[in-house]
Amino acid sequence: MSNPTDNNSATSSITPNFSAFSSFTTYKPSDSFSSFESDSSPSKSSSSRKNRDKIADKKQRRNRTTFTTFQLHALEAAFDKTHYPDVYARETLAAKVQLPEVRVQVWFQNRRAKFRRQEKQDCQGEEKHSLKDTMPSWSWMSENKTDTPPMLPPANTLSSTHNNGISDEFFKTSEGKEVYGFPFAEYGTPADNTHVSKTGNVFHLNFEDSDKKSMKKESPQTPSTSSPFISEYHPPFIPYYIPNQSFSNAFNQYPMPFPYPIHFEPPQLTHSQENC
């Protein structure tokens, strides 16, 4: 049998020691950690950002050079001579105006850009001015505008120039008689036997009774087309003298002149007319 004292010692060794775990269960922040939290406050972070922004602004900021009147005159005179000076010319000019050669080079770059802008604006202004000059002005329409319509010529008068471009002088001979573009010297003038009525731009012929004159003369032949008044676009038309009124009435239904020559054969004379 075992001793009860041994059993008590075994049970005491098996039971865990909770005092060793008490230090892990209780959490207390250390002084160093609390100081780190205090350093990372929002106010300090914003101030650090402002400092960084100031440093960046100083890096991006360029030093602008102020030129005196003497320096500007010397630079402009050199620019008038050449827009692209070489290194030796820039160094000589920089020593003259007491500026670094880099500043002189930058000034020439800016001056060339300004010159190109001015040249482009001048070209655009000239183009607009030329367009205004070439465009027609419509002011005369407003000045000459009237409420009353223009007066039309009467129907019984004929304008000086017809629609086909032939003037009144074309239908007149040297004696002032109206003909149809060819001489009637050997056949007689139709103005003696006919009556021409002008309505607008169309001619109508009203033949009178010319039985006696037509019987005395034979049927005329077509005249030669060598007359300067006859053109290939307006073929001649020679009206034959028609003694009967029936033919003349039928002839009056068509406007004159015809686009092609029309020939009418005279009617056969009866024995009663021949005996007369």
From Swiss-Prot:
Residues 209-219 have a biased composition (Basic and acidic residues). Pfam families: Homeodomain (PF00046). GO terms for biological process: neuron differentiation; pattern specification process; positive regulation of transcription by RNA polymerase II; regulation of transcription by RNA polymerase II. Residues 28-46 have a biased composition (Low complexity). One of its GO terms (cellular component) is nucleus. Required for cell specification of the RIA interneurons. This is Homeobox protein ceh-8. The gene is ceh-8.
